[in-house]
């Protein structure tokens, strides 16, 4: 199970014996795997300050857990074609999350225990707040790129009726800057190629002879050029439609074509450079700007690499990790580590508030073996530590008993200090 129970009991002889009894029972009954959870000695300060820290740490705990879950989900979104590998990506200090929790050691360099508790908590809060700020800005940029790439895919796929033509046509395909002549693009069904060649000149008056040329085709038809006088455009469209030849509304604008091509190149470059491991929009097997499925006639070569693109560049496209995924991996680790440190702080603060001074308690990490055993495990703990708070222990059995001064519901209160750690971050 990816669930842990972090508990503590007083460190006197009687309660250490109780912990030993708990270990024996849970081991023999195969209820949980238990390990000591080392927490350093902190500067306690006043009890009033601990009460305030208890509330602050509770909020920080909730915030940290929410943050790492959002980061885990972001990893899944970036690795759209590798969701099964997301768990392998979510590490803490280079190890899997379970190993990190079960072998937890307080990071003295990052969070010095000699500092006042308030300072340690403040350091953790600022660290997590900065990670969240960066996460928001980076995922917002990712979402914009994803939306733009999805739009690009829509424009770069589909049939000749709907797809962009900027990557198909060239200036040489058109008669431009003529007062009298214009070049139209006509979509002809595959079965009617021969008919088009025989009849296009006679569909209307003033069609330039031998002016047609096939510039692209897909599975359904072909895209032909035809040049005619401007004055017969409407007549030609009507006659063409009668013969199931459809004039595509397209007029060559060199500036617009250049702008669209540059936009496509930029988006694909952003996708490759920023998120090479993600399939943010251009899924495997779908058409793309550089590698579309439309077969282009000799006027252009779609297989030709973009300017400055080497064979190595093309072979390595999609390999490696982009900045977003690298950032997520590094900062997920940092946020997760901070979260477990917060859990340790909560155990320390609650143990001092519960068991008093001088500081003397033992924290233990329990990993239930299976979900069905958690009820029995809870019964064992309540029985072993019942003596710590007879009123609270009784109230567990009698929900009508109110515990004076206790803000939690009785179902959330136990005679021992207890915090839950759930590593099911992607569920």
Curated annotation (Swiss-Prot):
One GO biological process this protein is involved in is: positive regulation of Wnt signaling pathway
Annotated S-S bridges = none
What Pfam family is a match, any one? V-ATPase_C
One example GO MF annotation: proton-transporting ATPase activity, rotational mechanism
Q: Where is this region: Disordered?
A: 298-320
> Which keywords does this chain's UniProt record carry?
Hydrogen ion transport, Ion transport, Transport
In which tissues is this gene expressed?
A: Predominantly expressed in the lung and kidney. Isoform 1 is lung-specific while isoform 3 is a kidney-specific isoform. Isoform 1 is localized in the lamellar bodies of type II alveolar cells. Isoform 2 is strongly expressed in the cortical and medulla collecting ducts and is found in the plasma membranes of renal alpha and beta intercalated cells.
Q: Kindly give the InterPro entries that the UniProt entry links to this protein.
A: ATPase_V1-cplx_csu (IPR004907), Vac_ATP_synth_c_sf (IPR036132)
- PANTHER family the record matches: V-TYPE PROTON ATPASE SUBUNIT C, V-TYPE PROTON ATPASE SUBUNIT C 2
Subunit structure of this chain's protein = V-ATPase is a heteromultimeric enzyme made up of two complexes: the ATP-hydrolytic V1 complex and the proton translocation V0 complex. The V1 complex consists of three catalytic AB heterodimers that form a heterohexamer, three peripheral stalks each consisting of EG heterodimers, one central rotor including subunits D and F, and the regulatory subunits C and H. The proton translocation complex V0 consists of the proton transport subunit a, a ring of proteolipid subunits c9c'', rotary subunit d, subunits e and f, and the accessory subunits ATP6AP1/Ac45 and ATP6AP2/PRR.
Belongs to which family? Belongs to the V-ATPase C subunit family.
Q: What job does the chain carry out?
A: Subunit of the V1 complex of vacuolar(H+)-ATPase (V-ATPase), a multisubunit enzyme composed of a peripheral complex (V1) that hydrolyzes ATP and a membrane integral complex (V0) that translocates protons. V-ATPase is responsible for acidifying and maintaining the pH of intracellular compartments and in some cell types, is targeted to the plasma membrane, where it is responsible for acidifying the extracellular environment. Subunit C is necessary for the assembly of the catalytic sector of the enzyme and is likely to have a specific function in its catalytic activity.
Q: What is this protein called?
A: V-type proton ATPase subunit C 2
């Amino acid at each position: 199970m990816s669930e842990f129970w972090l508990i503590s009991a007083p460190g006197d002889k009687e309660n250490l014996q109780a912990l030993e009894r708990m270990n024996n029972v849970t081991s023999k009954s195969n209820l949980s795997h238990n390990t000591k959870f080392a927490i350093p000695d902190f500067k306690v300060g006043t009890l009033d300050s601990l009460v305030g820290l208890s509330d602050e740490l509770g909020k920080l705990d909730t915030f940290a857990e929410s943050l790492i879950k959002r980061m885990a989900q972001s990893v899944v979104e970036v690795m759209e074609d590798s969701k099964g590998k997301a768990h392998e990506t979510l590490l803490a200090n280079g190890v899997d999350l379970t190993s990190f929790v079960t072998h937890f050691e307080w990071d003295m360099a990052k969070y010095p225990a000699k500092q006042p508790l308030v300072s340690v908590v403040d350091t953790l809060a600022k660290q997590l707040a900065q990670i969240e700020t960066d996460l928001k800005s980076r995922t917002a940029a990712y979402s914009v790129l994803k939306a733009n790439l999805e739009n690009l895919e829509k424009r770069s796929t589909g049939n000749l009726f709907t797809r962009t033509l900027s990557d198909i046509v060239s200036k040489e395909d058109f008669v431009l800057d003529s007062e009298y002549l214009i070049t139209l693009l006509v979509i002809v069904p595959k079965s009617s190629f021969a008919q088009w060649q025989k009849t296009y000149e006679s569909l209307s008056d003033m069609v330039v002879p031998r002016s047609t040329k096939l510039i692209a085709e897909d599975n359904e038809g072909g895209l032909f050029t035809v040049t005619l006088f401007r004055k017969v455009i409407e007549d030609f469209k009507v006659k063409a439609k009668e013969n199931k030849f459809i004039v595509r509304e397209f007029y060559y604008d060199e500036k617009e074509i250049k702008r669209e091509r540059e936009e496509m190149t930029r988006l694909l470059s952003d996708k490759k450079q920023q998120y090479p491991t993600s399939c943010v929009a251009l899924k495997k097997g779908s058409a793309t700007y550089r590698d579309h499925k439309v077969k282009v006639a000799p006027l252009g070569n779609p297989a030709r690499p973009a300017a400055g693109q080497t064979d190595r560049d093309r072979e390595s496209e999609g390999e490696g990790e982009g900045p977003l995924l690298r950032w997520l991996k590094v900062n997920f680790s940092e946020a997760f580590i901070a979260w477990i440190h917060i859990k340790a702080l909560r155990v320390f603060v609650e143990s001092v508030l519960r068991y008093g001074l001088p500081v003397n308690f033992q924290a233990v990490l329990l990993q239930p073996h299976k979900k069905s055993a958690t009820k029995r495990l809870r019964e064992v703990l309540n029985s072993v530590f019942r003596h710590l708070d007879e009123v609270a222990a009784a109230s567990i059995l009698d929900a009508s008993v109110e515990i004076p001064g206790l803000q939690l519901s009785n179902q959330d209160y136990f005679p021992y200090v207890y915090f839950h750690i759930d590593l099911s971050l992607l569920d």
